[in-house]
Regions:
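Iron-sulfur-associated redox domains of electron-transfer enzymes in respiratory
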Residues: 1-221, 449, 506-516, 521, ...
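Glycine-rich adenosyl-nucleotide cofactor-binding module
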Residues: 200-237, 460, 472, 479
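Ferredoxin-type iron-sulfur electron-transfer modules in oxidoreductases and energy-metabolism complexes
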Residues: 213-236, 254-354, 586-588, 630
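Ferredoxin-reductase
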Residues: 363-454, 511-513, 539-540
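FNR/FR-type flavoprotein reductase catalytic core
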Residues: 442-605
Length: 640
């Protein structure tokens, strides 16, 4: 690696030359009271390279706290806002741990579908790092291997008293130095040795010490998940304020909201930072909260950093900056203290912990995320119950949706927002597709108020659907509860349209009372077929309603059906509370784990595993699901 030497006076002139070039947006570390923050530089004298830690990490320039993804005009539809910054950025004074954090963010925003809003800014930037001179008392970057690095930057500065050593990490960095800096000299052997000494000194600066090798963190967490007392004790004082995730350089969760102007005819879709410690983070529109308590959210934060991302990407996503510790009002966010306590508690009960094997990871990418919805028209609207309506929708560009059974779309209503909705129609239905929508949140409530001919936006299809090919030749037992019939209908109708390819077909469907039954005409028509078995049930029947079917919860139907568990696949969808009871009954009938297929519901804001809302332990429902084989998730605590 090339190294150059420049005097501090010439380095200041280099910074001034960058600032004078109005084609560049020059960012640096500046004093802000008794703290430090990244901000635009107006002169080299503002630059502070002797800081301990900045309030926020430099990720804010690539993943801003507030960012417009899409604009809309009711007369024209949706349009993307260009993600490219008006000027290329030069960011001066980035500590090594924040550089490593950016590399982690790169992997996260690249996986599956890359985020163009993040990467356009990353690719148009130059990172000038600086080796740490002062270290925050909360910093433990040396323990995480992030205090001194030889990668990830364009230029890296080391303070050598009256001069800086500059490691050149990229061609962009070298070209920047050649163009704007003067009196740059090759480094001598003593300079190289001194830089090495400075980096070794950094490794001894930390006041925060682990009592064990940090490589044990993933396994420590694995052995501590079920220790509810440990998490309750450590989360007892948590305010659930989210300050720890707000300042974290590797937190990437976000929310998406629409913001209309006063005329309500124009607006924009905004992405804002979000945090898994906030109470409503995992709450869906119906009110179900899949992480309802502070201890479960507190635990999730640590598992996400130290276990889930390790399993998915091969790195512990904590760089040891210490910002979470320094910004926690009740002083409970120190990862070093928590992991030391965890280690000693496990040791006290005789648990042996060995380093986890680093998984072999190959990042799969499939192009860029398209946050811009396609315009579509409501061509038919059929009320089904007091709460559910069936919408038939046609894409305005004339294309088919080309979905798989079990997938979902993100539906946009201008000025209100976007919501994930399961596709109810079979892929064999061409020209249009159907969505059965329950009125529960702001988007679905507004959608119910729209009329035939009104416009909506559609993104998708998304997710992992049912494998209709794998099911060919098998007996199929569909078990649907309530609105769960909607996603199952896409596969059920596909099977009926290709009936000769499948074995026996049984549908068990339950709802609360007769008036809440969905697709009633279709279901009643099944009685005329001799190739489908259908059994309905209701939880209860009011005295003034006629009902000739079963009365009882959905599991009361399972004993009424004879089937061969070796040839039958059970396909299950319904409210969260239903799954464990249905699975227990299926297991009592000797149905193998891999013959049980489930469709799960979670909050989804992006559809491609970036926003973090749908995460259940290490799984992202929006891209790994929503359809799962039970054998793959039976050991995932948050799944069922």
């Amino acid at each position: 690696m090339k190294m150059r030497i420049i005097s501090k006076e010439d380095f200041a002139n280099f910074v001034e030359a960058l600032i004078k070039d109005k084609t560049l947006n020059v960012i640096g570390v500046k004093a802000k009271g008794d703290k430090f923050a990244f901000g635009p530089l107006e002169s080299a004298s503002e630059l502070r390279l002797d800081y301990d830690v900045t309030i926020l990490p430099p990720k804010k320039y690539f993943f801003p706290q507030r960012e417009t993804l899409v604009t809309y005009d009711l007369a024209k539809g949706f349009a993307a806002k260009s993600p490219i910054e008006a000027k290329p950025m030069v960011i001066i004074g980035v500590h090594p741990y924040d550089i490593v954090a950016l590399l982690h963010m790169d992997e996260i925003f690249r996986e599956t579908k890359s985020d163009p809003y993040y990467f356009e800014k990353r690719q148009a930037s130059i990172i000038i790092g600086v080796n740490i001179q002062k270290m925050s008392k909360w910093c433990f970057a040396p323990a995480m291997g992030c205090a001194a690095i030889d990668y990830g930057y364009d230029l890296m500065l080391t303070d050598l008293g009256n001069r800086y050593a500059i490691n050149i990490g990229s061609q962009k960095g070298e070209q920047l130095l050649d163009k704007y800096a003067k009196n740059v000299k090759p480094a001598l052997a003593r300079d190289i040795q001194l830089v090495g000494q400075k980096k070794r000194e950094v490794m001894e600066m930390s006041q925060q010490k682990f009592d064990f090798p940090p490589e044990l963190i993933p396994e420590l967490l694995s052995k501590s998940y079920e220790k509810s007392g440990f998490w309750e004790k450590h989360a007892e004082k948590c305010l659930a304020c989210g300050s720890c995730v707000l300042v974290c350089p590797t937190c990437y969760c976000f929310d998406v909201k629409d913001q209309a102007d006063l005329s309500l005819e124009y607006g924009e879709r905004i992405r804002t930072w979000d945090g898994c410690l906030l109470e409503d983070f995992a709450k869906i529109a119906s009110g179900e909260n899949f992480r309802p308590t502070r201890p479960t959210r507190y635990r999730h934060r640590y598992f996400k950093k130290g276990k889930y991302l390790f399993d998915r990407f091969g790195f512990i996503s904590c760089v040891g900056c210490g910002r979470c510790s320094s910004n926690c009002l009740p002083d409970i966010a120190n990862p070093v203290k928590l992991f030391n306590d965890m280690y000693h508690e496990l040791r006290s009960i005789g648990e042996q912990v060995a380093p986890a094997a680093v998984p072999e990871v190959e990042i799969q990418t499939e192009g860029n995320i398209d946050y811009v919805p396609k315009l579509a028209t409501i061509v038919k609207k059929v009320p089904m119950t007091a709460k559910e309506t069936l919408f038939e929708i046609k894409l305005d560009d004339g294309t088919d949706l080309n979905h798989k059974p079990g997938q979902f779309v993100e539906v946009s209503v201008f000025g209100v927002g976007e919501a994930p909705i399961s596709i109810s129609s079979s892929p064999t239905k061409k020209g249009t597709f159907e969505l059965c929508v329950r009125k529960v949140g702001s988007v679905t409530t507004r959608l119910h108020a729209l009329s035939v001919g009104d416009k909506v936006g559609i993104r998708g299809p998304f997710g992992n659907g049912f494998d209709a090919e794998q099911l060919k030749g098998k007996d199929l037992l569909f078990i649907a509860g309530g609105l769960g019939i909607a996603p199952l209908r896409s596969l059920f109708n596909y099977v009926l349209d290709n009936r000769k390819d499948y074995g026996r077909v049984i549908l068990l469907y339950g709802c609360k009372e007769p008036r809440e039954m969905l697709f009633g005409d279709e279901l009643r028509a099944l009685a005329k077929r001799n190739d489908v078995e259908f059994k309905p049930t209701v939880d209860w029947c009011p005295e003034n309603e006629l009902w000739e079917g079963n009365i009882g919860v959905i599991t009361t139907l399972i004993p009424q059906v004879n089937f061969d568990p070796e040839t039958t696949y059970a396909i299950v969808c319904g409210p969260p509370i239903m799954y464990k009871f249905v699975i227990a009954d299926l297991k009592s009938r000797k149905v193998p784990d891999d013959h049980i297929i489930l469709s799960l519901e979670r909050r989804m804001k992006c559809g491609v595993g970036k926003c973090g809302h749908c995460q259940i332990n290490q799984i992202y429902v929006c891209k790994d699901g929503p359809v799962f084989n039970y054998s793959k998730i039976k050991g995932v605590p948050e799944a069922l």
